[in-house]
């Protein structure tokens, strides 16, 4: 289902949203006008969250063996990947026809660097299942020609027919992928300067030294994420409760990038009790 091109860098226009009502649900303006539904699956803890998210991804792979999975990195989806590997080892999943496209990659890190997202994905999923290496796609962090790399990656995503299911986490400031607050909603793949809060959050992966954290990254844009046929977000911990409430029960605004998911026709939020404690 195509994503209507009415998103600007600054505001969401309610009349324009209503013009696309068959595809997208309008933003929450007030209780009387509210007509969208964010599908929420509440889980008791991180393990339960990971299991239920893996259930959704497993169903996608089983029902469409040659599906395109949009994959995410960070701490939250690790448990989901562990469950997928378990199911592969039990003979329940076959990744041989699956194509993957990752959300993002640090700019300037060689893929063999232990903290590159290429390494993360191989360590947590790809090395443990039968996905064809030729079907694995990530932005090339070593390509310092940002314009060329962004065009290349957008072309890759188009060439595989777009994303069937996009897995996401959410940052404390509402970023998804490396789409930081105030980034335009209508961007495809682009190069971003990482926000200080993002650098702070990611320094734990670099021995706690923020000087080692790359300061730029390539990321799928909001436009590309919204074009996915299904979007699945995983969220856990009390530290995410405030942003979950703000993103999905507040206004749709580039100040909170994840808020745009309120308008996606097939968005599922899977969270533990702590993360969903304020909604």
Where are these regions (language model features)?
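Short beta-strand segments
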Residues: 70-74, 102, 139-140, 167-170, ...
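Ligand-binding beta-strand-loop-alpha-helix segment within the catalytic cores
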Residues: 93-166
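ATP/nucleoside-binding phosphotransfer catalytic cores, i.e., glycine-rich phosphate-binding loops
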Residues: 220-223, 227-279
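N-terminal glycine-/serine-/threonine-rich phosphate-binding loop
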Residues: 36-69
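Class I SAM-dependent methyltransferase SAM-binding "motif I" and its flanking Rossmann-like core
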Residues: 177-222
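Short, Lys/Arg-enriched N-terminal segments with co-localized hydrophobic residues
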Residues: 24-37
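Glycine-rich N-terminal segment of FAD-binding domains in flavoprotein oxidoreductases
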Residues: 63-89
């Amino acid at each position: 289902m195509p994503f209507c091109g009415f998103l600007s860098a600054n505001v969401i226009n309610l009349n324009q949203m209503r013009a696309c009502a068959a595809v997208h649900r309008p933003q929450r303006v007030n209780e009387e006008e509210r007509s969208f539904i964010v599908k929420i699956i509440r889980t008791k803890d991180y393990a339960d969250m990971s299991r239920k998210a893996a259930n959704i991804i497993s169903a996608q792979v089983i029902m469409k063996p040659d599906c395109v999975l949009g994959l995410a990195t960070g701490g939250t989806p690790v448990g989901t990947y562990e469950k997928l590997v378990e199911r592969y080892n039990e003979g329940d999943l076959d990744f041989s026809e699956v194509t993957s496209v990752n959300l993002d990659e640090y700019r300037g890190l060689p893929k063999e660097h232990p903290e590159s997202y290429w390494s993360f994905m191989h360590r947590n999923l790809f090395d443990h299942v039968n996905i064809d290496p030729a079907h694995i796609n990530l932005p090339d962090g070593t390509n310092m020609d940002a314009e060329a790399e962004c065009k290349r990656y957008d072309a890759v995503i188009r060439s595989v027919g777009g994303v069937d299911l996009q897995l996401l986490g959410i940052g404390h400031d509402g970023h998804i992928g490396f789409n930081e607050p105030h980034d335009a909603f209508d961007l495809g793949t682009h190069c971003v300067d990482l926000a200080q809060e993002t650098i702070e959050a990611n320094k734990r992966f670099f021995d706690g030294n923020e000087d080692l954290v790359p300061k730029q990254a390539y990321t799928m844009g909001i436009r590309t994420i919204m074009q996915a046929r299904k979007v699945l977000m995983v969220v856990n911990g009390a530290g995410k409760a405030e942003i979950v409430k703000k993103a999905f029960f507040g206004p749709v605004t580039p100040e909170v990038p994840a808020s745009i998911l309120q308008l996606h026709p097939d968005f599922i939020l899977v969270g533990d009790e702590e993360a969903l404690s304020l909604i």
